[in-house]
Swiss-Prot record:
Pfam families: Meth_synt_1, Meth_synt_2. The gene is MS1. GO terms for cellular component: apoplast; chloroplast; chloroplast stroma; cytosol; peroxisome; plant-type vacuole; plasma membrane; plasmodesma. This is 5-methyltetrahydropteroyltriglutamate--homocysteine methyltransferase 1. Binds 2 Zn(2+) ions per subunit. InterPro entries: Cbl-indep_Met_Synth_N, Cobalamin-indep_Met_synthase, Met_Synth_C/arc, UROD/MetE-like_sf. One of its GO terms (molecular function) is copper ion binding.
Amino acid sequence: MASHIVGYPRMGPKRELKFALESFWDGKSTAEDLQKVSADLRSSIWKQMSAAGTKFIPSNTFAHYDQVLDTTAMLGAVPPRYGYTGGEIGLDVYFSMARGNASVPAMEMTKWFDTNYHYIVPELGPEVNFSYASHKAVNEYKEAKALGVDTVPVLVGPVSYLLLSKAAKGVDKSFELLSLLPKILPIYKEVITELKAAGATWIQLDEPVLVMDLEGQKLQAFTGAYAELESTLSGLNVLVETYFADIPAEAYKTLTSLKGVTAFGFDLVRGTKTLDLVKAGFPEGKYLFAGVVDGRNIWANDFAASLSTLQALEGIVGKDKLVVSTSCSLLHTAVDLINETKLDDEIKSWLAFAAQKVVEVNALAKALAGQKDEALFSANAAALASRRSSPRVTNEGVQKAAAALKGSDHRRATNVSARLDAQQKKLNLPILPTTTIGSFPQTVELRRVRREYKAKKVSEEDYVKAIKEEIKKVVDLQEELDIDVLVHGEPERNDMVEYFGEQLSGFAFTANGWVQSYGSRCVKPPVIYGDVSRPKAMTVFWSAMAQSMTSRPMKGMLTGPVTILNWSFVRNDQPRHETCYQIALAIKDEVEDLEKGGIGVIQIDEAALREGLPLRKSEHAFYLDWAVHSFRITNCGVQDSTQIHTHMCYSHFNDIIHSIIDMDADVITIENSRSDEKLLSVFREGVKYGAGIGPGVYDIHSPRIPSSEEIADRVNKMLAVLEQNILWVNPDCGLKTRKYTEVKPALKNMVDAAKLIRSQLASAK
């Protein structure tokens, strides 16, 4: 019985790749140094999978930034602004596309389906001159082979690649991305031919868009593309891998009829209905790669349940055609539980990170083949039983409070325009008020103080003194820049979710449970293992201290319940919305305590609201209903004169704008600087928005400092579709990852731009 892993985390168990990348970007190390760290990581991953008994080990799932960007490089689809002139694409062009450089901005970055991973969106048009410009897939296959490991090279499939792309600026609206298939397929053929020549016997093509709602023409593109590739694929075993959801019946029919394809991979964790399709009919003689081990969470697999699913499938496809797999790439989970030396033993027994999931996949494959590891299986059953019965998981008071929410929709008593009038009387802000999103740069010194305080090497008194000084520095800087609504800079916070989770019951924390978000940026999601409540106030002390340093309004900064949920590893023993309502009640207590503590502007970030949106339209309404309701619960108890802000990230808002309005926030700030036009088009098309809105005026993800003219131009474009009395001027996200040398001039230019336009508007009256 064979085993397979869809993909594996790249960062390394101690984030080795992150530090190597950042050292290279800062000019402190060479390309050779970076390549050595990368090669060592790849080698250890392949050897680890091989040692565990994995038959189908992936290669080319490693990336220095992103696998879609790797595909863009493979196809030579470099936008003209990066000055690429042909030949093998080097790190300079590659990283310029990902991060921008001193003279040109980065390509757009967006969520990878409904995960917290981001990919770099290809910019395509009829003029793109495709060429085979990165031999990475072949090189990595050969690299593994030289180490004695035969791998399955993984490529982003051609149809998914095009459907995940966008039309470049200036391309005619009638342009169809799929019209480029005849141009990219010859390059796929070259790559596949080279892989065959290098000795590959299997190839994996990831076509995750098959789980989306695709109309007939898009499904036909799959049929046509694979018919075109058939002769090149001949002689290879070809796995088409899907993940993240059920595959719709029509797409299943299309997929299982593709020419040249010998194996199909399905997510059977999130895709429970796919099982019914397989049971109703699976093509004879083909392989089924059964994704029964969850690639997106950290809970130990239920061996008994998985084994029973696999045995049922074995009866349909046959023993020699069933392969045990992960539900998706393990990129979306933490790397290795072995590094968690401080985690509570009971909770630890309930978990499995990527390295443990490799063991789980192989244990299930062996059990199916009649070589069951009895000790491992009984330990698994004991851990599951302990989790089900542990008193740490259930809190009756929380269960009752959450149950009492049913039947009410928790809205503020007054409508938004009346509230904004009450708030303006109190805050007295100019038109186009300026603010920032919350965090300010975190210096090495600041991180050291936090780390030492956590390790009890610094007294509480010294810690408070250091944080107070940092807050004072941030407040003084904002006053000097003449920003209207201030923030305290969040120097006490390591992460916008972890900080709250550490103070809520029902959460556990890892030391090294890092997951890649984009590029070198990793997040360490908390683990929600039980009912959630707030034992005491979490942010009031610091926010009140910051407000005492200035006469200007100071924003209290909270992370919203939906974002805490979507950026955590969430318990899988109750529906997600029930956990979300519990978090909402805890945040509601905090909002009301901030108001009592004299904070008149409170921001409740829902950066991740959209990313939790199910992939299929039929499931959107239910999700949006409970997500928006959770947000309203947090602030339904405050006075009209308290201004509630929210912030959202990387969102394609067009499809959820009515839900955003229904959140009923007083002001919404949006991270949109890489997707300007998309956002403004929503308002251009006549959506009436009565609350305050601050579309980000510059991109904080790039080191580039925008000029005041550029920012003013952006604000003017916004004023063409938004009323001047509702527009706010702000960066598109928090400034934590930037340096002060970048932040000061950028914010100065932002304030100058706002003042310039204010004076233009005043003189135009």
